[in-house]
């Protein structure tokens, strides 16, 4: 997992009225929390810096951030995961951000997005792809957490499926999502019969 550095400022004023003032100054209020912290750290993030993280995929994939937090004349450094971003659905404006501070020596439980790759044989035959589980809960050291998990669907035919238990992940990653959860399956189209599919496959192989 790559590490990206971002600068923050510690804030003392908390509440909706102050949050609005901060946002008008292009500063997004946020909080840093974690099991090893004595107390939550309330912070401010430059709006442009937060948008840059989103554009780089940090809101959809897992990456370690190195938070450089200015606290007057002091500087606090924490490693963290971008846990949540609140965005106004109407104005598409940033409202708040949560950072989950982590120790690089302690395992964390995080959700990692699933990315389907390839084009299924079953879809080419007219089957319909159904995407089930879109995130997998795993336990690993922060630097061992992958940004996403790729699932190759190329060989899936109509009626086939891939479950969480079918994933082949490194030994240093423990999967916490139930093994029988379906990630993807190819369902038959309306009026589908195995005989028709077999005849179609034979025709394609002869052409």
UniProtKB/Swiss-Prot annotation:
One of its GO terms (biological process) is translation. The keyword Cytoplasm does not apply. One of its GO terms (cellular component) is cytosolic large ribosomal subunit. Pfam families: Ribosomal_L25p, Ribosomal_TL5_C. It comes from the Bacteria. One of its GO terms (molecular function) is structural constituent of ribosome. The keyword Signal does not apply. Keywords: Ribonucleoprotein, Ribosomal protein, RNA-binding, rRNA-binding. HAMAP family: Ribosomal_bL25_CTC (MF_01334). This is one of the proteins that binds to the 5S RNA in the ribosome where it forms part of the central protuberance. Part of the 50S ribosomal subunit; part of the 5S rRNA/L5/L18/L25 subcomplex. Contacts the 5S rRNA. Binds to the 5S rRNA independently of L5 and L18. Belongs to the bacterial ribosomal protein bL25 family. CTC subfamily. NCBIfam families: bL25_bact_ctc, PRK05618.4-2. This is Large ribosomal subunit protein bL25.
């Amino acid at each position: 997992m790559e590490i990206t550095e971002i600068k923050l400022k510690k804030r003392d004023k908390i509440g909706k009225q102050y949050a609005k003032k901060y946002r008008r100054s292009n500063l997004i209020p946020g909080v840093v929390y974690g099991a090893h912290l004595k107390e939550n750290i309330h912070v401010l993030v430059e709006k442009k810096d937060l948008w840059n993280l989103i554009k780089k995929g940090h809101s959809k994939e897992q990456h370690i951030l190195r938070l450089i937090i200015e606290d007057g004349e002091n500087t606090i450094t924490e490693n963290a995961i971008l846990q949540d971003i609140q965005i106004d659905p109407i104005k598409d404006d940033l409202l708040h951000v949560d950072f989950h501070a982590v120790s690089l020596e302690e395992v964390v439980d995080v959700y990692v997005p699933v990315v389907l790759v390839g084009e299924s044989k079953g879809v080419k035959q007219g089957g319909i792809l159904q995407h089930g589980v879109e995130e997998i809960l795993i336990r690993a050291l922060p630097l061992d957490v992958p940004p996403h998990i790729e699932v190759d669907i190329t060989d899936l035919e109509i009626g086939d499926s891939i479950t969480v238990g079918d994933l082949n992940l490194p030994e240093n990653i423990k999967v916490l999502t139930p093994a029988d959860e379906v990630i993807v399956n190819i369902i038959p189209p309306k009026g589908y019969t195995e005989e028709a599919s077999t005849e179609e496959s034979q025709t394609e192989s002869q052409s």
